[in-house]
Amino acid sequence: MSSKEQKTPNEQVSEEMEQQEVLPEAAEGVDLRDERIAELEAQLAEAQQHERDSLLRAKAEMENVRRRTELDIEKAHKFALEKFSGDLLPVLDNLERALELADKNNPELTAMIEGIELTLKSLQDVVRKYGIEIVGDTNVPFNPEVHQAMSLMESADHQPNHVMMVMQKGYTLNGRLLRPAMVAVSKAKA
């Protein structure tokens, strides 16, 4: 080195101090940048989590809508015949009444009675095929969901609160009540 290029000890010390002063300022800038980067990464992670949650909620909602729609379609198929079935019940009742009132001792009516019996049986088979069940048993506990009590009668032959007599049969369609059975209910003798 030439004498011009050589620095005095004071110059060297001041230059080193400047470098040391620059380093803390640079270090502070790096620290601020690192903090800002960490803050932005946290915000990004939070936004990504929020988006994931929103996506999962949307998927769950779509699945719920799909399930509800399937149930609605299934119910529509199951109970599409409800009105028609309700209109068919008086026909069943009339055929049963015709058989009850027919004079079975009259040989001239035998063929007609057999025809009504066959018609009633085939109609009952068809309605069962489509999910219509008859509610008309006696000696069963009274159930207000399927029975309508028309009268209470004392009876020693029947347990209390049991169906003694069916005045009009009831019907259900796939478990849903179309018409309650009109019944006489037993009560204990006083």
Curated annotation (Swiss-Prot):
SUPFAM superfamilies: Coiled-coil domain of nucleotide exchange factor GrpE, Head domain of nucleotide exchange factor GrpE. It comes from the Bacteria. GO terms for biological process: protein folding. The keyword Hydrolase does not apply. Gene3D superfamilies: 3.90.20.20, Head domain of nucleotide exchange factor GrpE. Belongs to the GrpE family. This is Protein GrpE. It comes from Serratia proteamaculans (strain 568). The lineage of its organism: Bacteria, Pseudomonadati, Pseudomonadota, Gammaproteobacteria, Enterobacterales.
